[in-house]
């Protein structure tokens, strides 16, 4: 018997059917999130740099960081969540680390990421 129950694996596969683009740490992405305000539901865009990505099947997540009015804002999204409407890759970044937590300490031009040319 495998390490995971086959029924659980089937249920997870059904929920992971949403099409998600390839992106990596260092990429600039726009995440459209469904926000419920009272009885209304709208889409809210969150654009920033992916500083971490966690690949765990249905439990996958990624963290996006942006600087808004001089304040650093980080938001962690569940990759396969129903609240995440779409993920758009705006720009590919050329980085050599999987986790870019060091960007938290940098500001201004020091926090820039080189664009991948290929």
Curated annotation (Swiss-Prot):
Q: List the disulfide bonds.
A: none
Keyword annotations for this protein, in alphabetical order, are:
Ribonucleoprotein, Ribosomal protein
Keyword Ribosomal protein listed? The answer is yes
Q: Which SUPFAM superfamilies match?
A: Translation proteins SH3-like domain
Q: Which GO terms describe its cellular component?
A: cytosolic large ribosomal subunit
InterPro entries, alphabetically?
A: Ribosomal_bL19, Ribosomal_bL19_sf, Translation_prot_SH3-like_sf
The reply on keyword Ribonucleoprotein is yes
| An example molecular function term from Gene Ontology annotations | structural constituent of ribosome
Q: Which Pfam families does the entry link to?
A: Ribosomal_L19
One BP term from GO: translation
Q: Which family does it belong to?
A: Belongs to the bacterial ribosomal protein bL19 family.
What exactly does this protein do?
This protein is located at the 30S-50S ribosomal subunit interface and may play a role in the structure and function of the aminoacyl-tRNA binding site.
This one is known as Large ribosomal subunit protein bL19
Species whose genome carries this gene: Hahella chejuensis (strain KCTC 2396)
UniProt lineage: Bacteria, Pseudomonadati, Pseudomonadota, Gammaproteobacteria, Oceanospirillales
């Amino acid at each position: 018997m495998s390490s995971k129950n086959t029924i659980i694996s089937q249920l997870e596969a059904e929920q992971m059917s949403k099409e998600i683009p390839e992106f990596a740490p260092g990429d600039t992405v726009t995440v459209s999130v469904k926000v419920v305000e009272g009885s209304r539901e709208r889409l809210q865009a969150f654009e920033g740099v992916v500083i971490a990505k966690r690949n765990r099947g249905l439990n996958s997540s990624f963290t996006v960081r942006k600087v808004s009015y001089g304040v650093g804002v980080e938001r962690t999204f569940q990759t396969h969540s129903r609240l995440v409407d779409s993920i758009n890759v705006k720009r590919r970044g050329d980085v050599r680390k999987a986790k870019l937590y060091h960007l938290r300490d940098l500001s201004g031009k020091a926090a820039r990421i080189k664009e991948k040319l290929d």
